């Protein structure tokens, strides 16, 4: 007989509830234990800066990592204490880590959520040389045993994570923890072999993220830079991974305005100029900025201090993608001043975000308050005739889309001359 949707959802909830009860049991904790490694290796160095002001606030008890469950569980505050840099900050870091281990000796949410475990393991491993190498043996041993438990749990969970981006984040946490624990080179190599198909699933051949979301693209780049550190410590060949990072870096670089910030296409605008700069630096991107990412669908023109960046790609769509209906929209800056920008869609309110995703919220042609694409109606603008290059006295970018053809019988052709 057939099972109704409601019955199916109840079955899923029942299985989820049983699994949660098992994970909270002593049997599951016993399953995670049994590690034989007593300390981490200090060879990794976190490539990302913390915030010294936030670190000082933690030291002065003006703020507490525990004030936010997710921020506390990710251990992002460890970078801030490292940036503060004092001996007292190192001691405070050890105390906070010891407290967390004591409160999380067995599985519980949200701290043991896979995405948070991946982030936490990466930060623990990459900063160990600062806070852990000079600690006493009791701290080192207790931390190593906790890391091994988390490592086993994440190894069970990462394949069930919803998005490929999240799975990559988990794999980088596993790789860094394995490298820091002195795992065999073959383990890191096997993890890298699992990583490459995931990367191919979420990137175009030109290096751009398939979501066409600049902020998401840069977050993925940072995770791959971290994974590469694990291959280096384990003496595993990471040259292919480096090539991937450089391709992604070339696309990220073409999104930058004169002030160093990233263009506001498709949910962009949340990455600071400082984070963009340090990411590109670690990516090792050199040479001339590219003018076109043909598969990702972006063009760039630069003349003197003026930069024009154009969205010339088909709209991406998916449950976890923020896609603006800004086909053939552009942004323009002169030096550090942004003159023409899109609104971005970083707001949490779904209604406001939907408004900011509309064609009217972008620097492109709109007709009768209608979006150029509407995934809900099965109507997606198709791009054609995209080119960028030299023209008499300057540069020219051209493209066309048919988003209004069905409704208005109109093809939108755009030419931008700089």
What do these predicted ranges mean?
Residues 1, 109, 210-213, 321, ...:
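Alpha-helix N-cap/helix-initiation motif
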Residues 1-8, 12:
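Single conserved hydrophobic/aromatic residue that forms the stacking wall/gate
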Residues 13-72, 110:
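Extended, charge-enriched "interface" segments that sit outside catalytic cores
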Residues 55, 59-61, 77, 100, ...:
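Tryptophan-centered motif/residue detector
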Residues 65-245:
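Aromatic-lined, polymer-binding surfaces characteristic
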Residues 204-345:
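Carbohydrate-active enzyme catalytic cores, enriched for enzymes
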Residues 288-418:
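Non-catalytic C-terminal accessory modules of carbohydrate-active enzymes
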């Amino acid at each position: 007989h057939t099972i109704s949707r409601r019955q199916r959802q109840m079955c899923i909830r029942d299985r989820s509830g049983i699994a949660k009860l098992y994970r909270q049991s002593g049997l599951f904790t016993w399953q995670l234990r049994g590690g034989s490694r007593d300390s981490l290796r200090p060879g990794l160095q976190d490539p990302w800066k913390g915030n010294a002001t936030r670190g000082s606030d933690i030291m002065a008890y003006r703020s507490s990592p525990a004030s936010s469950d997710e921020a506390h569980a990710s251990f992002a505050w460890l970078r801030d204490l490292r940036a503060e840099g004092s001996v007292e900050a190192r001691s405070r870091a050890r105390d906070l880590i010891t407290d967390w281990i004591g409160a999380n000796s067995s599985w519980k949410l949200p701290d043991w959520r896979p995405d948070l475990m991946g982030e936490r393991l990466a930060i623990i491993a990459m900063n160990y040389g600062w806070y852990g190498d000079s600690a006493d043996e009791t701290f080192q041993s207790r931390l190593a045993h906790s890391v091994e438990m988390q490592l086993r749990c994440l190894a069970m969970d990462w394949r069930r994570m919803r998005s490929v981006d999240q799975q990559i984040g988990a794999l980088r946490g596993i790789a860094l923890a394995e490298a820091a624990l002195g795992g065999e080179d073959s383990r890191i190599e096997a993890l890298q072999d699992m990583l490459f198909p995931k990367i191919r699933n979420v990137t175009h051949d030109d290096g751009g993220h398939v979501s066409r979301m600049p902020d998401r693209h840069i977050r993925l780049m940072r995770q791959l830079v971290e994974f590469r550190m694990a291959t280096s410590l384990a003496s595993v060949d990471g040259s292919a991974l480096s090539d991937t990072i450089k391709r992604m870096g070339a696309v990220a670089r073409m999104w930058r305005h004169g002030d160093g910030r990233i263009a506001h296409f498709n949910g962009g605008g949340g990455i600071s100029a400082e984070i963009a700069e340090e990411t590109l630096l670690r990516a090792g991107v050199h040479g001339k900025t590219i003018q076109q990412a043909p598969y990702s669908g972006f063009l760039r023109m630069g003349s003197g201090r003026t930069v024009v960046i154009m969205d010339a790609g088909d709209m991406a769509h998916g449950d976890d993608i923020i896609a603006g209906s800004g086909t053939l929209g552009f942004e323009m800056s002169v030096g550090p001043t942004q003159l023409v920008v899109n609104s971005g869609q970083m707001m949490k309110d779904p209604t406001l975000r939907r408004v900011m995703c509309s064609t009217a919220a972008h620097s492109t042609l709109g007709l009768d308050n209608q979006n150029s694409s509407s995934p809900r109606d099965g109507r997606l603008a198709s791009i054609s005739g995209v080119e960028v290059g030299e023209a008499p006295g300057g540069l020219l970018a051209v493209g066309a889309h048919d988003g209004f053809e069905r409704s208005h019988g109109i093809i939108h052709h755009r030419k931008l001359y700089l």
